UniProtKB/Swiss-Prot annotation:
Coiled-coil annotated spans: none
Ligand binding (NADP(+)): C45, G46, A47, Q48, R68, R76, S78, D108, K109, Q110, G158
Cross-referenced NCBIfam families: ilvC, PRK05225.1
Function: Involved in the biosynthesis of branched-chain amino acids (BCAA). Catalyzes an alkyl-migration followed by a ketol-acid reduction of (S)-2-acetolactate (S2AL) to yield (R)-2,3-dihydroxy-isovalerate. In the isomerase reaction, S2AL is rearranged via a Mg-dependent methyl migration to produce 3-hydroxy-3-methyl-2-ketobutyrate (HMKB). In the reductase reaction, this 2-ketoacid undergoes a metal-dependent reduction by NADPH to yield (R)-2,3-dihydroxy-isovalerate.
Catalytically driven reaction(s): (2R)-2,3-dihydroxy-3-methylbutanoate + NADP(+) = (2S)-2-acetolactate + NADPH + H(+); (2R,3R)-2,3-dihydroxy-3-methylpentanoate + NADP(+) = (S)-2-ethyl-2-hydroxy-3-oxobutanoate + NADPH + H(+)
Listed cofactors: Mg(2+)
Organism: Histophilus somni (strain 2336)
Statement: the UniProt record of this protein carries the keyword Transmembrane helix: no
Family stated for the protein in its record: Belongs to the ketol-acid reductoisomerase family.
Enzyme Commission numbers on file: 1.1.1.86
GO MF term list: ketol-acid reductoisomerase activity; magnesium ion binding
Enzyme class: oxidoreductase
GO biological process, one term: isoleucine biosynthetic process
Encoding gene per record: ilvC
Protein name (record): Ketol-acid reductoisomerase (NADP(+))
């Protein structure tokens, strides 16, 4: 196997990167009918596996779970989750030969082994589904020619996929058909029915490609979604302690600050997030964000370049082969940081507005990271819609995991692939922020309110225009229109 993307010529690469079409709701008029009466077997019962399966069953589809014999015999967590929810559970040999659609929802690093084990068992003309295309794009997995290969990728953690479905809604979803494996021309119909069964069609579906999904997903999770939050958490906490702030207060401000700040981002984009600040603080946050963008622009571009070339996947897979030595070392180092071990601050009260007023630097980091990730993806040929979902849209969901159990929880919830990329970014970004940005801070940038200053009306007007006219704000306003029923995401409700 080799990197599939690197086997394509330049025209094909650009075509695949640029695949992005927002689908009309009318295209889902048949909803799940194409898969009604067909046998669907899900491999793996983690967060995505279980919650997608629950939604699909509630949508009237026939769902069963195929697990490894040892998982069944030892009654591991995956077996317990599936059986306790009333699903048929069996081995690969028992369930896959009769399946019309086999959905591989195991972790990325298990995909090659899983596909090798199940492909001989998949019946002629059946379909194989993924929710992330790393195995196809980066590892170059070749699937038997009679098998249709599709992807349905909800742009949320599995728990949110279920919660939104229970509310009668759904989460934005990306679908794709592998161009090398659509022998009967049924791939799009399968993907549409699967997306509808999870509820995704109610929140907006992008028809994309395996390539565009993988390259944009890796970029988002490595930079703004995880890497920037990790680097920002560590640097901001250390600065607060250096300034003599109470460790419990500092820990709480950072732990819950990202969630509170990005809730505004979720509802009204960068514009609303910045509008939560006083005029003096907004001008300062804008200035800081421009400084951060200048210092980190090269790093965002390096990550994008390494993702496009396949260098990131090559290095990560070397670590897989080495027993995850780097991943485990970085995970251990994160667990020993001052922020992770700060007091919980359970008796400290911080109002919603105080998170903004005392977190101007954090707001600036969010703005800079979102815009850099979006701009870098678009410059690379990824469409604005995909870039939006892989940067701004998912950020509140990741921030919510930090609010639950700090960086530990974030790194548990995200995939090992995302966690590895997060460390690669944060390990470089944090020292840069500490050296280049922290020494330039002024009173009111972090840990206390920005002092009121005389406001230059023309400057404020120009800053407001710059915020509102950024391309991510324009596409974001359009896409959020499809998500009018979005609920608040908060660990503190």
């Amino acid at each position: 196997m080799g990197n599939y993307f690197n086997t394509l010529n330049l025209r094909q690469q650009l075509d695949q990167l640029g695949r992005c079409r927002f689908m009309d709701r009318e295209e889902f008029a048949d909803e799940v009918n194409f898969l009604k009466g067909k046998k669907i077997v899900i491999i793996g019962c983690g967060a995505q596996g279980l919650n997608q399966g629950l939604n699909m069953r509630d949508s009237g589809l026939d769902i069963a779970y195929a697990l490894r014999p040892e998982a069944i015999e030892e009654k591991r967590a995956s077996f317990q989750r599936a059986s306790e929810n009333g699903f048929v559970v069996g081995t690969y040999q028992q369930l896959i030969p009769t399946a019309d659609l086999v959905i591989n929802l195991t972790p990325d690093k298990q995909h090659s082994k899983v596909v090798a084990d199940v492909m001989p068992l998949i019946k002629q003309g059946a379909a194989l589904g993924y929710s992330h295309g790393l195995n196809i794009v980066e590892l170059g997995e070749k699937i038997r020619q009679d098998i249709t290969v599709v992807m349905v990728a909800p742009k949320c953690p599995g728990t949110e996929v279920r919660e939104e479905f229970k509310r009668g809604f759904g989460v934005p979803t990306l679908i794709a058909v592998h161009p090398e494996n659509d022998p009967k021309g049924e791939g799009l119909a399968i993907a549409k029915a699967w997306a509808a069964a999870t509820g995704g069609h109610r929140a907006g579906v992008l028809e994309s490609s395996f390539v565009a999904e993988v390259k944009s997903d890796l970029m988002g999770e490595q930079t703004i979604l995880c890497g920037m939050l990790q680097a920002g958490s560590l640097v901001c906490y250390d600065k607060l302690i250096a300034d003599g702030k109470d460790p419990a207060y500092a820990g709480k401000l950072i732990q819950y600050g990202w969630e509170t700040i990005t809730e505004a981002l979720k509802q009204g984009g960068i514009t609303l997030m910045m509008d939560r600040l006083s005029n003096s603080a907004k001008l300062r946050a804008f200035s800081l964000s421009e400084q951060i963008k200048e210092k980190l622009d090269f790093l965002f571009k390096k990550h994008m370049d390494d993702i496009i070339s396949g260098e990131f996947s090559r290095v990560m897979m070397e670590d897989w082969a080495n027993g995850d030595a780097n991943l485990l070392e970085w995970r251990e180092q994160t667990g020993k940081t001052a922020f992770e071990n700060a007091p919980k601050g359970e008796n400290i009260k911080i109002s919603e507005q105080e998170y903004f007023d005392h977190g101007v630097l954090m707001v600036a980091m969010v703005k800079a990271g979102v815009e850099l990730a979006f701009d870098t993806m678009v410059e690379t040929g990824i469409y604005e819609e995909s870039a939006y979902y892989e940067s701004l849209h998912e950020l509140p969901l990741i921030a919510n995991t930090i609010a639950r159990k700090r960086l530990y929880e974030m790194n548990v919830v995200i995939s090992d692939t995302a966690e590895y990329g997060n460390y690669l970014f944060a390990n470089v970004a944090a020292p840069i922020l500490a050296k280049e940005i922290i020494p330039t801070l002024k009173r009111g940038d972090l840990g206390e309110s920005t002092p009121a200053t005389e406001i230059d009306n023309i400057l404020l007007r120009d800053v407001n225009d710059a915020i509102r006219q950024h391309p991510i704000e324009l596409i974001g306003q359009e896409l959020r229109g499809y998500m009018t029923d979005m609920k608040r995401i908060s660990s503190q409700e």
